[in-house]
Swiss-Prot record:
The chain crosses the membrane at residues 36-56, 85-105, 116-135, 179-199, 215-235, 268-289. It comes from Homo sapiens. SUPFAM superfamilies: Mitochondrial carrier. Residues 1-11 have a biased composition (Basic and acidic residues). Changing residue 205 to M: In a breast cancer sample; somatic mutation. This is Mitochondrial nicotinamide adenine dinucleotide transporter SLC25A51. Its main location: mitochondrion. Keywords: Membrane, Mitochondrion, Mitochondrion inner membrane, Repeat, Transmembrane, Transmembrane helix, Transport. Solcar repeats lie at residues 28-108, 116-200, 213-296. It is a multi-pass membrane protein. GO terms for cellular component: mitochondrial inner membrane; mitochondrion. Mitochondrial membrane carrier protein that mediates the import of NAD(+) into mitochondria. Mitochondrial NAD(+) is required for glycolysis and mitochondrial respiration. Compared to SLC25A52, SLC25A51-mediated transport is essential for the import of NAD(+) in mitochondria. The transport mechanism, uniport or antiport, its electrogenicity and substrate selectivity, remain to be elucidated. It catalyses: NAD(+)(in) = NAD(+)(out). It is found in: Mitochondrion inner membrane.
Length: 297
């Protein structure tokens, strides 16, 4: 119920012990889910990067949408896609792991652990999200390149990585705690709710209808999760915009932002409406592209 349409198309498990494990072994060995996740991420980043930049400025400075857009206009078209390489590398890698590892780990846990499917799927989702966090340095560099305060310090991904090197390996993983929390819980909700949501949509009878349903399903989930985890991303962005100095805890940074924004919840969610629409489009594209590629590859 909680698995994707690709799960439903797997060969049925037979009673013979020899035949019982072969579908799972075959699925674990496949790279299709990794490739589809990678391509879906590339498609998404290329389309939505300018929107993400506006959102980033709002998260970091607490400014309005119009002011963030004006900042980007002043930066010029030349800088519009500045910093796209880290998210492109990060998203293609992490989404490949997110979809691929989830499928593989779900099969392995289901085979070796006598627990309800929702439990094994949940554990697989958390483990996939935790593995994604290995690539935190890419998200870290993306934050620095998008922050106009650092424009004069480095102009490309290589220079940004080099600037962090002198501060030690820990500097690359600044902001790891909120990323681990966000990845694990959001993966559980995404994979757990994707199936039930699609089941409640009108039955698709054509390829285009399936594509629309997959877009709606992914978009609704992405928008909901993007809004739910927005404050965590605000804190994560603030933590990762710093180079060197004290490693401040999540509660400490949250308290500082809370005071800066007059202790008003609405100010903490400044930019959330744009994030909602970006996530709606972004995860709609990701889910629709992923499911489409699963059928054609």
């Amino acid at each position: 119920m909680m698995d994707s349409e690709a799960h439903e198309k797997r060969p049925p498990i037979l009673t013979s012990s020899k035949q019982d494990i072969s579908p799972h072994i075959t699925n674990v060995g496949e790279m299709k889910h990794y490739l589809c996740g990678c391509c879906a991420a590339f498609n998404n980043v290329a389309i939505t990067f300018p929107i993400q930049k506006v959102l980033f400025r709002q998260q970091l400075y607490g400014i309005k949408t119009r002011d963030a857009i004006l900042q980007l206009r002043r930066d010029g078209f030349r800088n519009l896609y500045r910093g796209i390489l880290p998210p492109l590398m990060q998203k293609t890698t992490t989404l490949a792991l997110m979809f691929g590892l989830y499928e593989d780990l779900s099969c392995l846990l289901h085979k070796h652990v006598s627990a309800p499917e929702f439990a094994t799927s949940g554990v697989a989702a958390v483990l996939a999200g935790t593995t994604e966090a290995i690539f935190t340095p890419l998200e870290r560099v993306q934050t620095l390149l998008q922050d106009h305060k650092h424009h004069d310090k480095f102009t490309n991904t290589y220079q940004a990585f080099k600037a962090l090197k002198c501060h030690g390996i820990g500097e690359y993983y600044r902001g790891l705690v909120p990323i681990l929390f966000r990845n694990g819980l959001s993966n559980v909700l995404f994979f757990g709710l994707r199936g039930p949501i699609k089941e409640h949509l009108p039955t698709a009878t054509t390829h285009s209808a399936h594509l629309v349903n997959d877009f709606i399903c992914g978009g609704l989930l992405g928008a909901m999760l993007g809004f739910l985890f927005f404050p965590i991303n605000v804190v994560k962005t603030r933590i990762q915009s710093q180079i060197g100095g004290e490693f401040q805890s999540f509660p400490k940074v949250f308290q500082k932002i809370w005071l800066e924004r007059d202790r008003k919840l609405i100010n903490l969610f400044r930019g959330a409406h744009l994030n909602y629409h970006r996530s709606l489009i972004s995860w709609g594209i990701i889910n629709a592209t992923y499911e489409f590629l699963l059928k054609v590859i």
